[in-house]
Structure formats: structure tokens, C-alpha cells
Amino acid sequence: MLALISRLLDWFRSLFWKEEMELTLVGLQYSGKTTFVNVIASGQFSEDMIPTVGFNMRKVTKGNVTIKIWDIGGQPRFRSMWERYCRGVNAIVYMIDAAYREKIEASRNELHNLLDKPQLQGIPVLVLGNKRDLPNALDEKQLIEKMNLSAIQDREICCYSISCKEKDNIDITLQWLIQHSKSRRS
């Protein structure tokens, strides 16, 4: 009954206070980008994901905020597209497989190369270390250090350790995203 009332209130609020945001989700292949989109959209986790070829776009509504998500493929042949899809968005979400330590250096280099693009200056970045449920996954402090996030000074940057499978920290991730819908870029 309480859930029904909550949904009814969310619907009523959405009639008067709609907000939209656009974000781009990037990161190396197999980091969990499409899984993340599925989890925030439907709460469903699936082990059987097919790698994204090119990009997917999906709209997700949470409360009175509609989030347009560009999920860009992480294979090397698609990384040149990242910048184009990151221009003018409210936020860039950079996904890392926190348990695949051998790929951290490549992931760090791709993130810093992307953020060096002048057209992306000032766009907030949310770094998500996914797969925290796996053994040897890096925690937030380790991710900040290994990804050299303290060197990024020209924008807001935030880092969370999440698990799409266990739905760990998905709620605070959504809170961060919704907060950034209020700072729409022109």
C-alpha cells in the first residue's frame, strides 16, 4: 500500500516538476555499462550480456527526473566516438571493472585522454568501480589512487564502488545523477 502511495505521489510530482538530464556512459569493454543501465531502469541483473556494438540510447525515469543515457561501446574501435557523445551532457559516467586490475592502467589512460578534450571541459564526472562483489576488487580509495583522479582539477569528480549484481551503492549513484539534473548545461 505504501509503495502504491509513493508511486502515486511521484506521478503527481512529475506532472508539475519534470526535469531531464542527459548523460554518457563510457568505459572499457566488459566493465558493466549496459548492465548498469538495465539495473537502474528495471532492477534486473543478467549475467548474459552481449557487448554493445556502437551505442545504445535509453530513457529512464526516476521520480520526476528523466535520464537520457547514451551507453557507448567500450571496445577499442568505438572509443573514438566517446568524445562526440560526451559533448553537452549533464554528466559523464565512467565505468571500471574494479576486479580486473590488469585493465586499470588502460582504463586510467582512456579516462584522462577523454577528459583532456577541450569540448568536455567542466562536465562533471562520476567514476564507478563496478563488480565490488568480486574478490580483489579495488575499493573507492584504491580507485581514486590508481585512476589518478586527484589530478583532475577542471571539473567536479566523484567516485563510488558499486556492484550491479548485488545492487550495492546503486541508490547513492542515482542520487548523484538526479542532483546533477539540476545543473543542466547549455
UniProtKB/Swiss-Prot annotation:
Per the annotation, which location comes first and is thus the protein's main one? membrane
Tell me the compartments it is located in.
Answer: Late endosome membrane; Lysosome membrane; Cytoplasm, Cytoskeleton, Spindle; Cell projection, Axon
Record: residues binding GTP: 29-35, 71-75, 130-133
TM spans (from-to): none
Q: Position(s) of the covalent cross-link Glycyl lysine isopeptide (Lys-Gly) (interchain with G-Cter in ubiquitin)? A: K141
Uppermost EC category: hydrolase
SUPFAM superfamilies, per database record: P-loop containing nucleoside triphosphate hydrolases
- Entry EC no(s): 3.6.5.2
What are the protein's UniProt keywords? Cell cycle, Cell division, Cell projection, Chromosome partition, Cytoplasm, Cytoskeleton, Endosome, GTP-binding, Hydrolase, Isopeptide bond, Lysosome, Membrane, Mitosis, Nucleotide-binding, Protein transport, Synapse, Transport, Ubl conjugation
Q: Which GO terms describe its molecular function?
A: G protein activity; GTP binding
- Respond yes or no to whether keyword Cell cycle is given for this record: yes
Question: Which CDD domains does this chain map to?
Answer: Arl10_like
Q: Name one GO biological process term.
A: late endosome to lysosome transport
Q: Which Pfam families match?
A: Arf (PF00025)
Q: Which residues lie within the membrane without crossing it?
A: 1-19
> Is Protein transport among this UniProt entry's keywords?
yes
Record note on modification: Ubiquitinated at Lys-141 by RNF167, leading to its degradation.
What span is annotated as the signal peptide, if there is one? none
SMART domains in the record = ARF, RAB, SAR
Give Gene Ontology CC terms.
axon cytoplasm; cytolytic granule membrane; cytosol; early endosome membrane; late endosome membrane; lysosome; spindle; synapse
- Can you state the subunit structure given in the record? Interacts with tubulin. Interacts with BORCS5; recruits ARL8B to lysosomes. Interacts with VPS41; the interaction mediates the recruitment of the HOPS complex to lysosomes. Interacts (GTP-bound form) with PLEKHM2 (via RUN domain); the interaction is required to recruit the motor protein kinesin-1 on lysosomes. Interacts (GTP-bound form) with PLEKHM1 (via RUN domain); the interaction is required for PLEKHM1 localization to lysosomes and for ARL8B function in delivery and degradation of endocytic and autophagic cargo in lysosomes. PLEKHM1 and PLEKHM2 compete for interaction with ARL8B.
Family named by the database record: Belongs to the small GTPase superfamily. Arf family.
Instruction: Briefly state the protein's biological role.
Output: Small GTPase which cycles between active GTP-bound and inactive GDP-bound states. In its active state, binds to a variety of effector proteins playing a key role in the regulation of lysosomal positioning which is important for nutrient sensing, natural killer cell-mediated cytotoxicity and antigen presentation. Along with its effectors, orchestrates lysosomal transport and fusion. Localizes specifically to lysosomal membranes and mediates anterograde lysosomal motility by recruiting PLEKHM2, which in turn recruits the motor protein kinesin-1 on lysosomes.
Which PANTHER family does this chain map to?
A: ADP-RIBOSYLATION FACTOR-LIKE PROTEIN 8, ADP-RIBOSYLATION FACTOR-LIKE PROTEIN 8B
Query: What is this protein identified as?
Result: ADP-ribosylation factor-like protein 8B
Question: What's the source species for this entry?
Answer: Pongo abelii
Lineage here is:
Eukaryota, Metazoa, Chordata, Craniata, Vertebrata
